[in-house]
Amino acid sequence: MPSNPKRFQIAAKNYFLTYPNCSLSKEEALDQLQRLQTPTNKKYIKVARELHENGEPHLHVLIQFEGKFNCKNQRFFDLVSPTRSTHFHPNIQGAKSSSDVNSYVDKDGDTIEWGEFQIDARSARGGQQTANDECAEALNRSSKEEALQIIKEKLPKDFLFCYHNLVSNLDRIFTPAPTPFVPPFQLSSFTNVPEDMQEWADDYFGVSAAARPMRYKSIIIEGESRTGKTMWARSLGPHNYLSGHLDFNSRVYSNSALYNVIDDVTPHYLKLKHWKELIGAQRDWQSNCKYGKPVQIKGGIPSIVLCNPGGDTSFQDFLDKEENEALKDWTLYNAVFIKLTEPLYDGTV
């Protein structure tokens, strides 16, 4: 008697699906896959649409589950056309390395995703597999505290002897983006902005990112207190605010900002630190942190330098000193100087 055909069954946390000759859009496919009822929660789905050389479309899909999903129905992942009675049946595989599948699915770039990709230790090269699994589990946690707890329980040796480095690394990995500044006044409140100052802002903020010049000039604004210069500078867009000293900690400094506001930082201090990097909008430079590893700064953005006249605060007076002649020539080439003689607003800001 012929033997019974082998029953279909795949048990895996990560599934790799390929739908040949599938006319569905990636959005339609993602919507149907999200609505599939499964005993274990779905964590991540990525759908990629690809065209064969003959022009026929097909879809690649990576699905990650919270735990192993035991699939016994080879039609479970079938998709349905919304316009006609057509079913699209996939080739179904358990993905041994979800990271490798993720890279493969990404190769043509026409993708859509839902959820958060779960790091797969099987893709890590070298080291013991068990340690890779524990590290992957820690990285997939939602907070530094949860990740540390996993390491403490499952990698106690690393927790005990590498605690300082662990905390430092996890601080960087789980650091939330700096909270965006919300200006208390609308930009239209500043009705007395000097023409040169407004022109500088319009030429940078009034155009698309692609149209902005490389290494746009910075601007140094000198004026008395309560002239509104800080509020004006902070109302132009997403920025880094460096007040009194320079702090490039990822909790307060973002490489995604459009510009820097340097407020009440003395010119002598800035000269010792990163004058040319910040005022010159230089790209890809490092800053040494007092209690940590050097921070990589993406750069390439201008700075608005704010200062008061006289004393040790005036950048103009500082650059007029004989020993700063070369720095003055460089700064005049890389920055616009504005001296305020009246408030930037009518009323109180």
Swiss-Prot record:
A single cellular component GO annotation: host cell nucleus
Transmembrane segments: none
Active-site residue numbers: Y104
Residues given in the record as ATP binding sites: G223, E224, S225, R226, T227, G228, K229, T230
Subcellular location field: Host nucleus
EC number(s) on file: 2.7.7.-, 3.1.21.-
Keyword Nucleotide-binding: yes
Motif interval(s): RCR-3: 104-107
Keywords of this entry: ATP-binding, Covalent protein-DNA linkage, DNA replication, DNA-binding, Endonuclease, Helicase, Host nucleus, Host-virus interaction, Hydrolase, Metal-binding, Multifunctional enzyme, Nuclease, Nucleotide-binding, Nucleotidyltransferase, Transferase
Motif (RCR-1): 16-19
Motif stretch (RCR-2): 58-60
GO annotation, biological process: DNA replication
Cofactor(s) for this UniProt protein: Mg(2+); Mn(2+)
Top-level taxon of origin: Viruses
Cofactor mode of binding and number, as noted: Divalent metal cations, possibly Mg(2+) or Mn(2+).
Family matches, as InterPro entries: CRESS_DNA_REP, Gemini_AL1_CLV, Gemini_AL1_REP, Gemini_AL1_REP_central
Domain CRESS-DNA virus Rep endonuclease residue range list: 9-117
The keyword Hydrolase belongs to this UniProt entry's keyword annotation: yes
Domain notes: There are 3 rolling circle replication (RCR) motifs. RCR-2 is probably involved in metal coordination. RCR-3 is required for phosphodiester bond cleavage for initiation of RCR.
Annotated family: Belongs to the geminiviridae Rep protein family.
Subunit structure: Homooligomer. Interacts with the replication enhancer protein (REn). Interacts with host retinoblastoma-related protein 1 (RBR1), and may thereby induce the transcription of host replicative enzymes even if the cell is not dividing anymore. Interacts with host PCNA. Interacts with host SCE1 protein.
Described function: Essential for the replication of viral ssDNA. The closed circular ssDNA genome is first converted to a superhelical dsDNA. Rep binds a specific region at the genome origin of replication. It introduces an endonucleolytic nick within the conserved sequence 5'-TAATATTAC-3' in the intergenic region of the genome present in all geminiviruses, thereby initiating the rolling circle replication (RCR). Following cleavage, binds covalently to the 5'-phosphate of DNA as a tyrosyl ester. The cleavage gives rise to a free 3'-OH that serves as a primer for the cellular DNA polymerase.
Protein name: Replication-associated protein
